[in-house]
A protein has these predicted regions:
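Short, well-structured N-terminal submotif of metal-dependent ribonuclease cores
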Residues: 1-37, 53-65
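Active-site neighborhoods of divalent-metal-dependent phosphate/nucleic-acid chemistry enzymes
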Residues: 55-61, 69-88
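Positions that flank functional sites
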Residues: 43, 64, 82
């Protein structure tokens, strides 16, 4: 099954937060599932960290390594994505 992780789910997962239910952790770690994380969420994390609204236990620069280690694919944003959004 495919899963797109939202920002809070990812933050809870990377921080090992107890707010993330065990069944969700199991789905993320299940190698039969494919997990995705948007670069837009990484951008959101960077902004919120600068505003001291969120905290990561890991260094921000380790997000890509964490995703690679946990088989989470980072999805890019293209100009075409923005065009679709603009035309909604």
């Amino acid at each position: 099954m495919d899963f797109l992780l939202d920002t809070h789910t990812f933050i809870w997962f990377i921080n090992g937060d107890k707010l993330l239910p065990d069944n969700v952790i199991a789905k993320i770690k299940n190698i039969e599932n494919q997990c995705f994380f948007s670069v837009a969420s990484i951008w959101e994390i960077a902004i919120k960290m600068k505003l001291n609204k969120i905290y990561l236990q890991s260094d921000f620069n380790e997000i890509t390594d964490f995703c690679l280690a946990n088989d989470i694919e980072i999805l890019p944003i293209s100009f075409e994505h923005i065009q679709v959004l603009n035309n909604l």
